[in-house]
Regions:
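Short glycine-rich His-centered loop
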Residues: 11-34
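Active-site-proximal helix/loop segments of hydrolytic enzymes
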Residues: 3-7, 39-219
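N-terminal pre-catalytic segment of deacetylase/amide-hydrolase enzymes
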Residues: 1-15
Length: 219
């Protein structure tokens, strides 16, 4: 009998957070209104979860259905309770820009009387972003522009309160991935199709695998 081969992520714990709806927003949508960010986040999150589990990862998801409302604080608390090696927050952007960007907490913020994340989590999240983003972009094979690695402080919410709410309450490395810009015609054409959504999930898997491989000595 041939023993089963361990997956690339055996023993690795990931919290997948399909963004929206939360206490702040229902999320964005394509210009024609036919595709919502909430739907893209959910569909890609489901596909990513299946891929991660197929590679042996333990996966916790922050909500049970697409339309469930979960606060950003609760989402972070789910990742913390699972002692996740990575809290991966899936979002889509809007605006005149294009491409995929990864955000990490670059400074502490304050929300509901809590200051966070800790300096150690900020450092760990930055390191995760530096490994994750290049792997994701490489796996997309030019399908989307590399919009880079950015701090939470560059976002509207993070600029006001110091960091994104999910990052403030995170006690594990936290990344927010703006997978595409739904209001950009190129990005929209890519992510609206099942093939594009599958490609995105596969690329995110590659990012997690790269981070897990780089983290293996301490796993």
């Amino acid at each position: 009998m041939v023993p089963a081969q361990a997956g690339s992520l055996t023993g690795f714990v990931v919290c997948v957070d399909p963004g929206h709806t939360s206490e702040t927003s229902e999320g964005t949508a394509s210009r024609d209104g036919r595709l919502t960010e909430r739907h893209v986040n959910w569909v890609v999150g489901e596909r990513l979860t299946a891929l991660l589990r197929a590679e042996g990862a333990t996966v916790v998801v922050t909500k049970a259905s697409e339309n469930q409302i979960v606060t950003n604080r609760k989402r972070a608390e789910t990742a913390n309770a699972a002692h996740a090696a990575l809290f991966l927050r899936l979002h889509c952007d809007s605006g005149e820009q294009s491409g995929l960007a990864t955000y990490y907490p670059d400074r502490q913020g304050r929300r509901f009387g809590v200051t966070g994340p800790s300096p150690a989590i900020m450092v760990a999240s930055h390191r995760a972003a530096q490994i994750f983003q290049p792997a994701v972009i490489a796996a997309l094979h030019g399908a989307l522009k590399n919009a880079g690695i950015k701090g939470d402080s560059k976002t509207g919410v993070g600029g006001k309160q110091g960091a994104l709410t999910g990052s403030i309450f995170a006690q594990v490395p936290a990344l927010t991935v703006e997978m595409c810009v739904l209001t950009n015609s190129h990005d929209y054409k890519f992510i609206r199709t099942p093939a594009g959504q599958d490609a995105m999930a596969q690329a995110l898997l590659a990012g997690v695998e790269a981070y897990a491989a780089a983290s293996s000595p301490v796993r």
